[in-house]
Design a protein with these regions (language model features):
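Glycosyltransferase catalytic domains, chiefly GT-A lineage
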Residues: 2-483
């Protein structure tokens, strides 16, 4: 028999442990509530669409397989040269891929069958009517980069919810997904929990359209993990050109390199090479209610991308992947879209003989549309003030605090002499224009510093790194300490 005194001690210890647990739980809840209140955000807890997504994916996966281009993969071909876009002196459309006529006919039949199926009776795509939000993909090395971009988004005052798609359970980091992201009105979505309904081999570079498909939002702004806006993006949803089209994209540096064979398969006339630039898909605005079919066809191109449609749409030129699939799909489905005409701008710092370019500036679509709707095309040489910079896509190398100070092919934070430098100082007129609202790069590094120091021991991908916070503090002190 246990003495009564021991029973009393055990009861008291149990009560104490329970009280401590409740206090810890309440403190976490109050901390999260305080963060949300202080930032003006509300926690994003949408209706669970997983059962509906399972049903949709089973039906849609069957459709993707039924209309697969059942021909050998396109793997052996001369890579097309990457040609810059010119509205005045466009290059010829490259034609480097050879596909036998009988295989073209098979692919055309499959493409036509898929288009007819989604035209007549598309699968019911689940989303919450009337919602708007931001969608991204991350995980592993990209998760710290995403947090920095998300904090830059919140600096604009935007309260749009965000859904961050991860590949699988291994990429789900509990502290980041359960504490950090919810405090910024964002949540993690594990893609494999949806795709398990009809298992398929989908690689990370194919994830973008799947994240867009399975987001809960009706209208989405997709942003790559390393892209962020300089202004609140809310108004983009409620003004032209998005309001009148339902699909908005931004340009890349290059001319189109889509193969003439693709246009045979899609039964479309090849567009003139001076019509528009190729697409830089780090930023996409899309309405599912108006462009479900375009999104379904873009997903078809990506699902069969590595074997067929990536080569057909780029022929191995720079950036081959999902970038050309979105407006190509809209064209094939005869659905409207608007691609910003203002040329993309490389940002960097000077080095002997050129620039260490580590980011890209994309411009305000509303300003751009105001010009083009009046017949003013700066890309064709018309004289007009430039639209404002709206997005910065800090794409190469990734500004991950754990690795940014390592040696890279492009070194954004070092001069050729090995001294610390600002990353984005040229073109001066572009940098001066967007800095009129405040020092953008300094603000960016404030978020890099916060992420490095507040979350140094939180990211699983940083487990093997030492001195992440210290490295960023050193850089900050030299470059911004006297500002």
């Amino acid at each position: 028999m246990i003495p009564r005194s021991c029973l009393r001690v055990r009861t008291l210890l149990t009560a104490l442990i329970l009280a401590l647990f409740l206090t810890w739980t309440l403190s976490r809840w109050h901390l999260k509530a305080y963060i949300l209140k202080s930032t003006g955000l509300s926690s994003h807890s949408p209706t669970d669409l997983t059962p509906s997504h399972h049903k949709f994916w089973q039906e849609f996966h069957s459709l993707l397989e039924r209309h697969a281009p059942n021909t050998p993969p396109i793997v052996e071909y001369e890579k097309a040269k990457t040609a810059s876009f010119s509205a005045h002196d466009p290059p010829l459309r490259p034609d480097t891929i050879y596909v036998p006529e009988d295989e073209i006919a098979i692919m055309k039949e499959a493409h036509t069958g898929f288009v007819n199926a989604i035209t007549k009776s598309p699968p019911d795509l689940p989303y919450i009517t009337g919602t708007k939000g931001i969608v991204s993909t991350a995980g592993g090395f990209y998760l710290p980069v995403l947090v920095i971009s998300l904090r830059m988004l919140r600096r604009t005052g935007s309260t749009l919810p965000m859904e961050v798609f991860l590949a699988d359970e291994q990429e789900y980091e509990p502290y980041i997904c359960d504490t950090v992201l919810p405090s910024l009105n964002a949540r993690c979505v594990v893609l494999s929990r949806i795709l398990i309904a009809a298992p398929a081999k989908i690689h990370k570079y194919q994830f973008k359209p799947f994240a867009m498909l399975f987001s809960s939002f009706e209208e989405i702004l997709f942003l790559d993990a390393d892209a962020f806006p300089l202004n609140k993006p809310e108004h983009l949803f409620t003004t032209d050109p998005f309001l009148s089209t339902g699909l908005l994209t931004w340009p890349d540096f290059w001319a189109s390199s889509a193969s003439p064979i693709f246009y045979q398969i899609a039964d479309l006339p090849p567009p003139p090479m001076d019509l528009r630039q190729s697409t830089e898909s780090g930023e996409i605005l899309l309405s599912k209610s108006s462009h479900t079919r375009s999104l379904l066809l873009a997903t078809y191109y990506n699902y069969h991308g590595p074997s067929h449609y990536y080569p057909l749409l780029s022929q191995g030129a720079a950036g081959e992947g999902d970038k050309e699939t979105f407006i190509t799909a809209a064209t094939a489905m005869h659905e409207p879209f608007y691609q910003v005409s203002e040329p993309i701008c490389a940002l960097g710092h000077p080095i002997p003989g050129g620039m260490a370019g580590s980011a890209m500036a994309q411009f305000d679509p509303v300003h751009d549309y105001t010009l083009t709707s009046r017949g003013v095309w700066r890309v064709k040489g018309d004289n007009a003030p430039a639209p404002a910079v709206f997005f910065i896509h800090a794409n190469y190398p990734k500004f991950n605090p754990a690795t940014i100070f390592e040696d890279h092919a492009v070194n954004p934070v070092f001069t050729d002499e090995g001294e610390y430098t600002r990353a984005w100082t040229i073109p001066e007129h572009v940098v001066q224009a967007y800095n009129a609202r405040g020092d953008v790069e300094k603000g960016f590094w404030e978020e890099v510093l916060w992420t490095a120091c507040e979350l140094e021991d939180k990211f699983e991908s940083w487990g093997g790194y030492q001195g992440v916070c210290e490295g960023v503090r050193d850089y900050w002190g030299v470059v911004f300490g006297s500002d």
